[in-house]
């Protein structure tokens, strides 16, 4: 089984086993409820078996390169958003920022990555405004890339992005992926996650 197909199968099976719909922008943030499954006390949806996280090599909106492979030793949270999202993306970013604040000294053990699904409108200026409005400035890296880089990333992470020319909004999978310090996909959080779940799980992800 290919790496991309394997990741897709793991994520889909985990979501279906908990009867969770992977919500997209324009859908209700309460479309599903995260239930802890068997595992080391994690409160998201635990992925079994745990697979190495797909590659991710982009740059933040200031131009600095960011590689997932360089973040070994930290827990990493990855989500896919866009600044013009009318509903779920602002909530995801706000809740991730709240979790990062709530972690206190443990915040040094996690890196939060938000990958654009709308590179045309996600300009550095738009990103700065978006993050500032949600208390997320300096609390996560908002990642951009060339069209080819982003297409590769979306495919590797099995992110469905509506790139049609007549789209009104960018429909996409609205979840957060939790990655261990060893670089393995351990857990997925549906869009109705709480900051408390992230605060609980980060120390566990950071030591595995």
Describe the role of every protein-language-model region.
Residues 147-201:
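Thiol/disulfide oxidoreductase modules built on the thioredoxin-like
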Residues 21-24:
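C-terminal motif of bacterial Sec signal peptides marking the signal peptidase cleavage site
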């Amino acid at each position: 089984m290919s790496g991309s197909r394997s990741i897709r199968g793991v994520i889909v099976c985990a979501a279906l086993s908990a009867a969770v719909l992977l919500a997209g922008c324009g859908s209700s943030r309460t479309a599903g409820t995260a239930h802890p499954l068997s595992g080391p006390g994690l409160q998201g949806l635990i992925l079994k078996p745990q697979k190495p996280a797909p590659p991710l090599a982009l740059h933040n909106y200031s131009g600095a390169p960011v590689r997932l492979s360089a973040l070994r030793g930290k827990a990493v949270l990855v989500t896919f958003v866009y600044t013009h999202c009318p509903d779920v993306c602002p909530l995801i970013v706000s809740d991730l920022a709240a979790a990062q604040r709530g972690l206190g000294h443990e915040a040094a053990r996690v890196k939060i990555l938000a990958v654009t699904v709308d590179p045309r409108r996600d300009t550095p200026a738009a990103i700065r405004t978006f993050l500032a409005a949600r208390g997320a400035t300096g609390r996560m890296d908002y990642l951009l890339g060339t069209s080819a880089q982003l297409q590769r990333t979306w495919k590797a992470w099995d992110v469905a992005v509506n790139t049609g020319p007549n789209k009104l909004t960018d429909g996409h999978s609205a979840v957060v992926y939790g990655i261990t310090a060893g670089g393995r996909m351990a857990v997925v959080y549906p869009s109705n996650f709480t900051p408390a779940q992230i605060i609980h799980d980060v120390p566990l992800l950071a030591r595995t």
